[in-house]
């Protein structure tokens, strides 16, 4: 037996990735594994239940509402040519059973099924730092997921920073595609500085970057910083009108097509969506933190699916 030492490694590890691969750093960090010094999750999921559902209503379209679908889609193990037929059958059986258990619980939160994928429940195990990256216009993994893990790292007393860009479900730099200058710096340079500090002890000040760095929606060349995600201020917007509104899924009546979907569903009311507009603000207001909407709804039949999307009417 010959002992092989990994002399190329100092034993310190970082994790990064986007979407499913951005979720894995959260999952590993909340195990408290030794050697994981920092993570840079991009559009990662903090809680699988709230990613797929919204308080008992389905958030995703039917096929992709199942965790097993995404687990299968993102599993590189199926491409392993050395797998035996028995191993493939066991993996398929596992994903099938996962689907059955999820369907059994419906759209309500079931701790037995969803608890393992609710990483914020294990904030006390976190031992590493985090630089969390999230798109504010990501309609796949919402900002709620970023917020939950940001608070989890704070609860654990670990250094956590955030970069919030105006993009969708993207990494701020994509090979051969595009890149976003993050406050005048290349994204890759920022990540290099962060990881170099935590893995190699480079004194570059990366750990002292702003708590929150956010790209402005009114001018995407501008970035602003904040000391925290939320503020001590609260603003309540109420509606004096009362009544009952009924919406349905009659696409033809709404005149919805692939070309006009955003206009019909996002900027005006129809039989498929209702738009509520506040009075114009008398001065510029920056919403910092979480937007909460309280409403009551009943589902007559069909899929229990609902969604809410706050929009700046000046942008619409």
Which residue ranges define each predicted feature?
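Gly/Ser-rich "nucleophile elbow"/oxyanion-hole loop immediately N-terminal to the catalytic nucleophile
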Residues: 1-14, 19
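Short beta-strand immediately N-terminal to the catalytic nucleophile in serine-hydrolase-like folds
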Residues: 15-17, 42, 133
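Glycine-rich nucleophile elbow surrounding the catalytic serine of serine-hydrolase chemistry
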Residues: 17-27, 140
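Accessory cap/linker subdomain of secreted extracellular hydrolases
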Residues: 27-125, 203
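Short beta-strand/loop motif that positions the catalytic acidic residue
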Residues: 126, 132-134, 138
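Conserved alpha/beta-hydrolase "acid-adjacent" motif
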Residues: 139-146
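Catalytic histidine neighborhood in serine/cysteine hydrolases
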Residues: 153-172
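C-terminal, loop-rich substrate-recognition/catalytic regions characterized by aromatic stacking residues
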Residues: 179-316
């Amino acid at each position: 037996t010959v002992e092989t030492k990994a002399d190329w490694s100092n034993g310190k590890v970082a994790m990064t990735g986007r979407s499913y691969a951005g979720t894995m750093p959260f999952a590993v960090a909340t195990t408290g594994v030794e050697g994981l010094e920092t993570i840079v999750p991009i559009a990662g999921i903090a809680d699988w239940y709230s990613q797929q559902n919204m308080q008992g209503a389905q958030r995703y379209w039917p096929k992709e509402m199942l965790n097993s679908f995404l687990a299968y889609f993102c599993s590189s193990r199926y491409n392993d040519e050395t797998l035996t037929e028995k191993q493939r059958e066991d993996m398929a059986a596992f994903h099938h059973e996962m689907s059955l258990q999820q369907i059994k619980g419906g759209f309500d939160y079931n701790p037995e099924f969803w608890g393992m994928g609710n990483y914020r429940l294990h904030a006390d195990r976190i031992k590493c730092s985090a630089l969390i990256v999230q798109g504010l216009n990501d309609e796949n993994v919402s900002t709620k997921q970023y917020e939950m893990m940001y608070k989890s790292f704070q609860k654990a007393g670990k250094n956590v920073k955030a970069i919030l860009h105006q993009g969708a479900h993207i990494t701020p730099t994509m090979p051969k595609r595009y890149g976003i200058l993050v406050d005048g710096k290349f994204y890759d340079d920022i990540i290099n500085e962060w990881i170099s500090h935590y893995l190699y002890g480079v004194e570059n000040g990366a750990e002292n970057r702003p708590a929150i760095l956010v790209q402005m929606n009114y001018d995407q060349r501008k970035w602003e910083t904040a000391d925290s995600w939320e503020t001590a201020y609260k603003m309540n917007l109420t509606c004096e009108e009362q009544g009952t509104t009924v919406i349905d899924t009659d696409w033809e009546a709404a005149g919805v097509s692939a070309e006009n979907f955003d206009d019909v569903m996002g900027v005006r009311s129809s039989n498929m969506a209702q738009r509520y507009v506040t009075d114009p603000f008398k001065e510029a207001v920056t919403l910092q933190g979480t937007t909460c909407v309280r409403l009551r709804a009943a589902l007559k039949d069909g899929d229990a699916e609902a969604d809410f999307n706050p929009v700046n009417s000046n942008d619409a």
